[in-house]
UniProtKB/Swiss-Prot annotation:
Modified residues (Cysteine methyl ester): C213
Parts of the chain that traverse the membrane: none
Protein name per UniProt: Ras-related protein Rab-4B
Activity control, per UniProt: Regulated by guanine nucleotide exchange factors (GEFs) which promote the exchange of bound GDP for free GTP. Regulated by GTPase activating proteins (GAPs) which increase the GTP hydrolysis activity. Inhibited by GDP dissociation inhibitors (GDIs).
Job description of the protein: The small GTPases Rab are key regulators of intracellular membrane trafficking, from the formation of transport vesicles to their fusion with membranes. Rabs cycle between an inactive GDP-bound form and an active GTP-bound form that is able to recruit to membranes different set of downstream effectors directly responsible for vesicle formation, movement, tethering and fusion. Mediates endosomal tethering and fusion.
Comment on protein domains: Switch 1, switch 2 and the interswitch regions are characteristic of Rab GTPases and mediate the interactions with Rab downstream effectors. The switch regions undergo conformational changes upon nucleotide binding which drives interaction with specific sets of effector proteins, with most effectors only binding to GTP-bound Rab.
Motif (Switch 2): 65-74
Amino acid sequence: MSETYDFLFKFLVIGSAGTGKSCLLHQFIENKFKQDSNHTIGVEFGSRVVNVGGKTVKLQIWDTAGQERFRSVTRSYYRGAAGALLVYDITSRETYNALTNWLTDARTLASPNIVIILCGNKKDLDADREVTFLEASRFAQENELMFLETSALTGENVEEAFLKCARSIPNKIESGELDPERMGSGIQYGDASLRQIRQPRGSAAQTKQQCNC
């Protein structure tokens, strides 16, 4: 009945309205393009189990509305997110210019160490491009983000965007930047034995003490 997995990661898909966030989620979950997609009202949800470094990981993905009138609602879903796709439309400079605000929200409301990948969506509309690859690459580098251009229509780089983000999370667990034992980390163990992943530097006693708080 229930799915078995080693880890569960909470993901967000954030960005301005009309950037194709719901279509990216649908392409990743269903492996097909979502025709006649309307603007998301509030939040939508999807999940998929993937393989990350030999571990089975369930991605629990929240697709948030990009319209300003829903921001107060969607911000509540940022809490406890381990990863995020920050999406803009390569044919709309307005959506690109709004990225800083979305990024600030994510790092303030979710976690300073949330893993974020910048996605320039609608790559299939290259002839109508308003934001160059180089410009977005620089933004990503300056803000310590991963970066890919994607197409929810053709599926190009959609799978890779989610998986690239997911692959970075175990590294942050091992380095101590993300702590699955901390409430709101956006990470849950499906297999209790995996708690050993974060026992470097002789921190077992410290972790035990933290858990008793």
